[in-house]
């Protein structure tokens, strides 16, 4: 008696030449009988009907497959020795169990992937998902069998040309590492390394003609990449026909990016010096062959640039911005201190700094009349202890010379009468005059040439507006300098101060710079050519020199809004002003008819006070009006109105009520 166990699966094709078989459902004890119409080596339709037993004797194969993709495993129940039959059945069951587990694992894996990709409901609702999975697996096996000849051809080609391809890719990786290591090193770094080497050192070779190395690397990279691509394309076309071009393109793109570009260049960036020591000498040898070709290409490219009207740059240089980036990187890495970084950046910016930005204004200048005696000069020196004092005639803005305290000591040692000698007699005349638009860099050079330490600053109309000293110039580089005789008041007068009295309340010296106050309040302070200090900002807000006790409300923009960048401009415009602006009440603490000395900034938390105040008028800084008027001279009034609405964040709301001290 023969039987068959039925299992839903996908297997290879085979046929049984019997019409009816005893079937035993896999994993169950009940049996089925089946009828089918056999056809040699083809799928056969089958009809199954339930029955208890149906014993037949026939010749059969071990397995068969029908159009319903059902697999039958045959077993014998008679005409065999019982012991040998048990062994055969045991081996077959173990083999079939392994196959079943493998197939079920594939099905479960497909189901899990389907759940993650399409969702549980879609996967479970798909009709015939298991059968489809088996079908795909079967097709994959068939495709693999059909592809075996092609794979054999590919392996044959790799065996014949693989070494050539590997050599070309290795050369391409070598050139990529060489290029990155050379370009990563700054020119000044190459010069520094070359000075520490002997005459035949690699960095001396690199410093002598870096263009020669870069040209050789460029030509070598181009040649080996083209050769490798052509080799793979030829082999792929011979194997796959026209489809080989696409296959070769995709393969070489991945290979070149991964093996010859990204990986080698990443190694060279992190080990520039070490890689350069290895690659420079081989590249120098290759340049003997490739560089002549490169020179021809260079001349051709220069001719093209000349035709286009462009000029090439012969030697690389480092811009000021690049140098600042290097300084920031060095500071972050700990190579230099933050103070050192600030000093170097100040040196770079000193050419763009004007004398009027560092001078002492005339109102703060301590000067002496030329008709005063040396006794008066001695008394002034005891009080202020300045080594140099400007000397004026009749009025303070008419400075004629500079009096030195060292000369006063000479008169004392000579025993001359101090009362009978005037300051004008001992003053150094004439004084050195400089325009307020002069750069600090040029002023420092003039101080060195003229061997003077003080100059009188004039405006464009020839009026005296202040003095500038060598100490002022040095302080622009190293920061404020104080000596042991400077009092607390003098230090505050020189640098300004910001004292936080309470939450949101700041007492500010009027000499404090706008940048310093903006950083402390984290607000965007309006800036213009009219003022650079808090005193100028306050006078701009009031429109006149305010008296002690007067107050004004100003609307300032939060600094964080400016830092968000242009991407958030549309979002910012949709926000309410109270979300991005802040009101400050500015009160004058000290001052006189000529200037403001101290100011208090008090944060106002209720932004609605702006709309509720009926006695408040909007004031636009003059420089904003000036910019607006330049846009359209024909519609001046309309442009000014639009500018007032557009720069609401910088508007100053002035309170008409004045508080008297």
UniProtKB/Swiss-Prot annotation:
CDD domains linked to this entry: CBS_pair_CorC_HlyC_assoc (cd04590)
Give the matching SMART domains: CBS (SM00116), CorC_HlyC (SM01091)
The topology of this chain with respect to the membrane is: Multi-pass membrane protein
Which superkingdom, per the lineage? Answer: Eukaryota
Q: Where is the composition biased (Basic and acidic residues)?
A: 648-661
One matching Pfam family: CorC_HlyC
User: What Gene Ontology terms describe where this protein resides (cellular component)?
Assistant: chloroplast envelope; chloroplast membrane; cytosol
Cite the CBS domain residue spans from the record. 359-420, 426-484
Q: Which Gene3D superfamilies match?
A: 3.30.465.10, CBS-domain
Q: Which InterPro entries match?
A: CBS_dom (IPR000644), CBS_dom_sf (IPR046342), CNNM (IPR002550), FAD-bd_PCMH-like_sf (IPR036318), FAD-bd_PCMH_sub2 (IPR016169), Ion_transp-like_CBS (IPR044751), Transptr-assoc_dom (IPR005170)
TM segment ranges: 105-125, 162-182, 213-233, 239-259, 285-305
Report the main location listed first in the record: plastid
Compositionally skewed regions (Acidic residues) per UniProt:
560-570, 630-643
Extract the transit peptide range from the record.
1-71
Residue numbers spanned by region Disordered: 559-578, 628-661
Q: Where in the cell is it found?
A: Plastid, Chloroplast membrane
Keyword field: CBS domain, Chloroplast, Membrane, Plastid, Repeat, Transit peptide, Transmembrane, Transmembrane helix, Transport
Alphabetized GO MF terms: flavin adenine dinucleotide binding
The name this protein goes by in its record: Putative DUF21 domain-containing protein At3g13070, chloroplastic
């Amino acid at each position: 008696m023969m039987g068959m166990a039925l299992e839903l699966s996908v297997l290879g094709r085979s046929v049984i030449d019997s019409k009816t078989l005893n079937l035993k459902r896999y994993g169950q004890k009940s049996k089925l009988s089946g009828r089918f119409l056999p056809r040699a080596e083809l799928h056969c339709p089958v009809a199954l009907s339930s029955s208890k037993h149906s014993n037949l004797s026939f010749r059969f194969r071990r397995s068969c497959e029908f159009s319903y993709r059902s697999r039958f495993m045959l077993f014998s129940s008679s005409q065999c020795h019982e012991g040998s039959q048990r062994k055969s059945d045991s081996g077959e069951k173990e083999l079939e169990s392994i196959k079943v587990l493998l197939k079920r694992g594939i099905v479960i894996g497909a189901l899990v992937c389907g759940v993650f990709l399409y969702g549980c409901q879609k996967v479970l609702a798909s009709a015939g998902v298991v059968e489809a999975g088996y079908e795909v697996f079967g097709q994959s096996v068939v495709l693999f069998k059909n592809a075996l000849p092609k794979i054999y051809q590919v392996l044959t080609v790799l065996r014949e040309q693989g070494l050539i391809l590997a050599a070309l890719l290795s050369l391409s990786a070598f050139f990529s590492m060489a290029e990155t290591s050379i370009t990563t090193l700054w020119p000044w770094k190459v010069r520094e390394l070359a000075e520490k080497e002997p005459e035949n050192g690699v960095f001396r070779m690199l410093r002598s003609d870096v263009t020669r190395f870069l040209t050789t690397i460029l030509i070598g990279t181009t040649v080996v990449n083209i050769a490798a691509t052509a080799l793979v394309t030829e082999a792929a076309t011979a194997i796959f026909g026209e489809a080989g071009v696409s296959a070769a393109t995709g393969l070489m793109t991945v290979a070149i990016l991964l093996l010859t570009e990204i990986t080698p260049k990443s190694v060279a960036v992190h080990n520039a010096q070490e890689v350069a020591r290895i690659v420079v000498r081989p590249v120098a040898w290759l340049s003997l062959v490739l560089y002549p070709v490169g020179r021809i290409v260079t001349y051709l490219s220069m001719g093209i640039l000349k035709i286009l009207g462009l000029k090439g740059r012969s030697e690389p240089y480092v811009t000021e911005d690049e140098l600042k980036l290097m300084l920031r990187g060095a500071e972050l890495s700990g190579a230099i201190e933050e103070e050192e970084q600030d000093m170097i950046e100040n040196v770079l910016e000193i050419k763009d700094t004007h004398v009027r930005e560092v001078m002492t204004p005339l109102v703060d200048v301590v000067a002496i009349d030329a008709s005063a005696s040396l006794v008066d000069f001695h008394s002034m020196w005891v009080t202020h202890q300045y080594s140099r004092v400007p000397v004026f005639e009749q009025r303070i803005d008419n400075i004629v010379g500079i009096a030195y305290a060292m000369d006063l000591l000479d008169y004392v040692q000579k025993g001359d009468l101090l009362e009978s000698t005037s300051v004008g007699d001992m003053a150094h005349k004439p004084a050195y005059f400089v325009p307020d638009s002069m750069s600090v860099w040029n002023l420092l050079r003039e101080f060195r040439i003229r061997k003077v330490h003080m100059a009188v600053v004039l405006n464009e109309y020839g009026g005296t507006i202040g003095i500038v000293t060598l100490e002022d110039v040095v302080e622009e580089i190293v920061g404020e300098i104080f000596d042991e005789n400077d009092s607390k008041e003098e230090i505050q007068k020189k640098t300004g101060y910001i004292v936080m009295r309470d939450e949101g309340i700041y007492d500010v010296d009027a000499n404090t710079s706008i940048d310093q106050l903006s950083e402390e309040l984290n607000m965007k302070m309006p800036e213009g050519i009219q003022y650079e200090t808090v005193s100028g900002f306050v006078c701009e807000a009031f429109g006149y020199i305010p008296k002690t006790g007067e107050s004004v409300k100003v609307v300032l923009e939060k600094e964080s809004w400016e830092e968000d960048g242009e991407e958030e401009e549309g979002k910012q415009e949709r926000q309410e002003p109270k979300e991005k602006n802040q009101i400050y009440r500015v009160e004058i603490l000290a001052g006189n008819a000529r200037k403001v000395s101290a100011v208090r900034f008090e944060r106002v938390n209720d932004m609605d006070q702006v709309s509720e105040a009926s006695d408040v008028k909007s004031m636009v800084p003059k420089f904003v009006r000036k910019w607006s008027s330049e846009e359209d001279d024909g519609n001046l009034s309309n442009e000014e109105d639009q500018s007032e609405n557009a720069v609401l964040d910088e508007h100053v709301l002035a309170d008409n009520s004045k508080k008297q001290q």
